[in-house]
């Protein structure tokens, strides 16, 4: 989706349209739902896909065949050089959806057992499921992202709230975790979701719950025993806390 402003190629662009450029600075509106919203305006959709994430991150133009070819060749080089088993693709749902689907298919066609997880930071399972390969939801719009895995942000949302809801009502408490799993039918492959309780973008679980070890044990037990592929953030294995504003 983006590079850093100091990347050497940004300083000497191969083509003018290698990145998305505007008369002035244009930042994304972060409205990922415009990618599939039948009522979205063209302006909102374009700004979501083409706007820069922040000023220091020039937005790559995946609709440019030269860019797409470069990204594909670069990915294959890294897989071969470092003997990689998978990629995590940042801000997957901000990309040109046609271009990123072509890139993902090219990689998985070349390496059928290679896994790619996309950061689809949304809070609705139907919207997240849209981005997984062979989605029944995206098929309604004749789209297939070819992405094997997405991150289970709704499970993360539940785990970082339920253990503080001691006086749970009908819709609070552990029912949130249960409801998350009842919606697995929306995914084409729920067993290939990436599950987590914390990562580099979120608060530390033990910071949220004030280092309550029993709550940490319960969350980790759910993570270790549910469907999906669990991801441990560095320090999770020892229950590390940390203030995100001070560098966790």
Where are these regions (language model features)?
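Substrate-binding/active-site clefts of carbohydrate-active enzymes
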Residues: 1-76, 81, 102-110, 120, ...
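Active-site-proximal helices and loops of the catalytic beta/alpha 8
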Residues: 12, 74-76, 80-85, 91-188, ...
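Active-site-proximal cap/lid insertion segments
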Residues: 39, 43-48, 52, 166, ...
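Short, solvent-exposed helix-loop connector elements
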Residues: 206-209
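Conserved interdomain hinge at the start of the Helicase C-terminal
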Residues: 218
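C-terminal substrate/ligand-recognition segments
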Residues: 224-236
């Amino acid at each position: 989706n983006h590079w850093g402003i100091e990347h050497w190629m940004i300083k000497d662009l191969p083509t003018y349209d290698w990145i998305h450029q505007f008369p002035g600075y244009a930042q994304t509106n972060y409205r990922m739902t415009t990618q599939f919203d039948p009522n979205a305006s063209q302006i909102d959709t374009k700004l979501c896909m083409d706007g820069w994430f922040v000023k220091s991150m020039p937005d790559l133009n995946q609709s440019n065949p030269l860019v797409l070819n470069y990204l594909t060749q670069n990915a294959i080089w890294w897989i071969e050089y470092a003997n990689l088993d998978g990629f995590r693709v940042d801000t997957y749902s901000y990309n040109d959806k046609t271009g990123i689907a072509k890139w993902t298919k090219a990689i998985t066609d070349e390496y059928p057992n290679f896994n790619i997880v996309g950061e689809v930071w949304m809070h609705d399972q139907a919207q997240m499921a849209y981005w997984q390969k062979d989605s029944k939801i995206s098929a309604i719009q004749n789209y297939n992202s070819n992405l094997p895995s997405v991150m289970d942000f709704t499970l993360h949302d539940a785990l970082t709230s339920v253990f503080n809801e001691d006086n749970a009502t009908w819709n609070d408490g552990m029912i949130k975790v249960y409801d998350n799993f009842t919606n697995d039918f929306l995914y084409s492959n729920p067993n290939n979701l990436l599950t987590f309780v914390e990562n580099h973008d979120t608060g530390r679980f033990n910071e949220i719950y004030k280092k309550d070890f029993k709550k940490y044990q319960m969350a980790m037990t759910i993570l270790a025993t549910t469907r999906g592929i669990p991801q441990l953030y560095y320090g999770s294995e020892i229950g590390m806390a940390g203030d995100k504003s001070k560098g966790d």
